Amino acid sequence: GAINAAALVARQLIADADEIEETRRFPATITDALIASGMLRMLLPKVYGGGEVDPGTYLQAVIALAKGDGSVAWNVFVANSAALIAPFLPETSAHAIFDDPAALIAWGPPNGQGTKVVEGGYLVNGSWDFASGCRQATWMGAHGPVIEADGNPRLNPQGKPLIRTWLFPVDQAERHDVWNPIGLRGTASDSYTVRDVFVAEDFSSTREYLEDRQISGPLYAFTMQGLYAVGVAGVALGLAQAMLVDFRALAAEKTPRGRPRLA
């Protein structure tokens, strides 16, 4: 199952963690292992080749990965969160993206930049940040308000600007290699710019309303934010558990000056 697969990948991560942090890259062997083990599509619907695992299994798998390396666990959680757009897409669009076994969507959070409505779809322009996993991505996305032809934002039923997601192949975005924080260098949470990229209506969606889903089932009855929180918690719990193991090992070996060993 997913938990055992994650534990096996985590063994590789422990050996490669220093390299990931130093190079700010995942070794090809790690990327291949994530793809082969299905770690990047645990939350993807089964009809698109995903695992469609329950939230508890997903949580334990992310915890196991985080014990090996925080950057990899983070990117696995982000990739799975992005895969949650699949139930909201037309079937042909979802297959176009996820029939590739290496499929991975990377994107940054909405930052207020809107996208104009044009005939047949949208014209995307703007820059976004924190696109974790963009170096392994096959597709990228952007989120923001929809700007109608008259220049006004499209409103949701609550009277607020409707936030929509636009998807496009990774080569249509210009990525900026700017991510370099201690401890999570490997996530490649870089910035990116999109210039005059046309996105057809079928490759755009909003994840705000469960009734818009094309695929139902127990997993997709959860809100996107609810499952997002499961992934964040898994990364934090796995890192904390690994830290405690290392601390106990250090405490058992360290000898304070003038005193016997602590354990």
Across the structure, where does each feature detected by a protein language model lie?
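Glycine-rich beta->alpha junctions and the first turn(s) of the following alpha-helix
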Residues: 182-263
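A structural signal for short hydrophobic beta-strand segments in well-ordered beta-sheet cores
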Residues: 112-116
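DPxDG-like acidic metal-binding loop motif
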Residues: 127-173
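Short Gly/Pro-enriched turn/cap motifs at secondary-structure boundaries
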Residues: 102-105, 181-185
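A generic structural signal for beta-strand entry/edge sites
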Residues: 119-125, 139, 189
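Buried hydrophobic positions in well-ordered alpha/beta secondary-structure cores of metabolic enzymes
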Residues: 61, 124-126, 194, 240
